[in-house]
Amino acid sequence: MRNIYDLANELERGIRALPEYKNLVEKKEAIATDAEASALFKEFTDFQEDFYAKMQAGTMPTAEEQAAVQELGQKVEANALLKEYLTAQQSLSVYLNDIERIIFKPLQELNN
């Protein structure tokens, strides 16, 4: 049997070789070269992290926070570079979700 860590490292290399991953890297690089998109991306990710942290802590978002999420989402959707990045991220997440399901299958079987 192969070493589990070798398999994990091989999986990492496989993910990096996926066309969807390479496309996502290209989209991220395009954002980095555009000041407006880069600033909006940072604002979006910072807000998203804060929002999720509050949710995990059991704090429900206020009406103002919900409105801010919608407003920020509209700004992101209006920016072509960010919209392309999020679409590419979604494409890669299909693979990652499938991989996660496969990896955790033995643990799920133990709980059944």
UniProtKB/Swiss-Prot annotation:
Lineage top rank: taxon: Bacteria
Family, similarity comment: Belongs to the UPF0342 family.
Name of the featured protein: UPF0342 protein stu0643
UniProt source species: Streptococcus thermophilus (strain ATCC BAA-250 / LMG 18311)
